[in-house]
From Swiss-Prot:
PANTHER family: PHOSPHATIDYLGLYCEROL--PROLIPOPROTEIN DIACYLGLYCERYL TRANSFERASE, PROLIPOPROTEIN DIACYLGLYCERYL TRANSFERASE. GO terms for biological process: lipoprotein biosynthetic process. It is a multi-pass membrane protein. Catalyzes the transfer of the diacylglyceryl group from phosphatidylglycerol to the sulfhydryl group of the N-terminal cysteine of a prolipoprotein, the first step in the formation of mature lipoproteins. HAMAP family: Lgt. The chain crosses the membrane at residues 9-29, 41-61, 80-100, 109-129, 167-187, 197-217, 226-246. Its EC number is 2.5.1.145. One of its GO terms (cellular component) is plasma membrane. Belongs to the Lgt family. One of its GO terms (molecular function) is phosphatidylglycerol-prolipoprotein diacylglyceryl transferase activity. This is Phosphatidylglycerol--prolipoprotein diacylglyceryl transferase. A 1,2-diacyl-sn-glycero-3-phospho-(1'-sn-glycerol) binds at residue 131.
Length: 262
């Protein structure tokens, strides 16, 4: 089993979980700022947004996690803020981040679709890296399996939990997001009929579908009417993505807008 603590500086422990999230954030900010000028967005506005959105998204992710496990946290109030032990629900962070983005874009007079389009691939790569925090914490895993011989030894050993090998669902989602990120880069360069909002829609559909399938492999999720809560949200994401495609195809606004068209 790998030590979840990456660096120990006296009483201060820096965990791999935090490093994975911060690394994903830094890469996401870099990629978003690089793409921003092509969408007529000032890169400094991206930094201003991150300074507001990131802590609120972390809070939203934690709040979502605690709410759906309130039976436990109501008896362990001291653990509610112990995010260093894990327990950040991605959907909570995404919903909070999207709300902050909408408000921020409105106040900065930035087209919301443009902001969402440049944020979507960056969020996807950040999620891909962030899932490795679950790996180090030995959480967000799936059902027991006989063996994991197809995986590298360090992953196989870390997925040996409570006397059994577990499905490395963190890895499946990480790779799924990485593939989605690569496809977005290809679409942006090669898809001539790409419309404003299409990248956002692709993210919602791609991530929603992958999460719905992978979530079905997990054993630690809350059930609601026969599906896990995250699977229901995945259905909502897919539905929103499809509606965005239909709506934006009618608008016919190209992905990159010139000043004259804007």
């Amino acid at each position: 089993m790998l030590d979840p603590i990456a660096i120990q500086l006296g009483p201060l422990a820096i965990r791999w979980y935090a490093l994975c999230i911060v690394t994903g954030l830094i890469l996401a900010v870099y990629l978003t700022m690089k793409e921003a000028p092509r969408k007529k967005i000032i890169p400094d506005d991206i930094l201003d947004f991150i300074l507001v959105a990131f802590p609120l998204a972390i809070l939203g992710a934690r709040l979502y996690y605690v709410i759906f496990r309130f039976d436990y946290y109501s008896q362990n109030l001291g653990e509610i803020f112990a995010i260093w032990n894990g327990g950040l629900a991605i959907y909570g962070g995404l919903i909070t981040g999207a709300l902050v983005l909408y408000i921020f874009a409105d106040r900065k007079l930035i087209n919301t679709w443009d902001f969402l389009d440049i944020a979507a691939p960056s969020v996807m790569i950040a999620q891909s890296l962030g899932r490795w925090g679950n790996f180090f914490n030995q959480e967000a895993y799936g059902a027991t399996v006989d063996n994991l011989d197809y995986l590298p030894g360090f992953i196989r050993d870390q997925m040996y939990i409570e006397g059994s090998y577990r499905q490395p669902t963190f890895l499946y989602e990480s790779l799924w997001n990485l593939l989605g990120f690569a496809l977005i880069l290809i679409f942006r360069r090669k898809w001539k009929s790409l419309r404003r909002g299409h990248i956002t829609a692709f993210y919602l559909i791609w991530y929603g579908f992958g999460r719905m399938v992978i979530e079905g492999m997990r054993t630690d999720s809350l059930m609601f009417f026969g599906l896990r809560v995250s699977q229901w949200l995945s259905v909502v994401f897919i539905g929103l993505g499809i509606m965005i495609v239909i709506y934006q195809n009618r608008k016919k606004a190209p992905y990159y807008i010139t000043e004259e068209e804007k």
